[in-house]
């Protein structure tokens, strides 16, 4: 079950879009939420917005859209590298997270028009 109260509004809007317009399954929505929450927690640490390093204690509700607008492809690569180095994530796991990030940024830039630049546009799928 997704607790929408823990998410920033733009993430909840994306999840609503995937349910209503893309007709994704509840499982897919849950995975998108998990993947993107993990990514946003990483961004919060990476951008030095928190001193907390325990991801289970990091909140994402307060990450403003202005921070999302600052994310570059290098930051996404840093996240995928973090998954490899910290969690020894396999390529399939990283590929799913990359896909979630790609769909999220496509929504923000092309559908919701909340950001001008899509940093995931040239993101390749990990192999």
Regions found by a protein language model. Give the residues of each.
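N-terminal core-binding DNA-recognition domain of tyrosine recombinases/integrases
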Residues: 12-27, 37-127
């Amino acid at each position: 079950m997704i607790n929408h109260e823990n998410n920033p509004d733009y993430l909840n809007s994306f999840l609503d879009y995937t349910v209503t317009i893309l007709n994704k399954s509840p499982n897919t929505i849950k995975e998108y939420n998990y993947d993107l929450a993990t990514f946003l927690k990483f961004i919060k640490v990476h951008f030095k917005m928190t001193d907390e390093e325990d991801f289970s204690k990091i909140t994402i509700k307060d990450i403003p859209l202005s921070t999302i607008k600052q994310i570059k492809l290098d930051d996404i690569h840093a996240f995928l590298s973090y998954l490899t180095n910290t969690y020894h994530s396999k390529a399939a796991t990283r590929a799913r997270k990359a896909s979630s990030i790609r769909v999220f940024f496509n929504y923000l830039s092309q559908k919701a028009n909340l950001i001008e630049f899509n940093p995931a546009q040239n993101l390749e799928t990990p192999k």
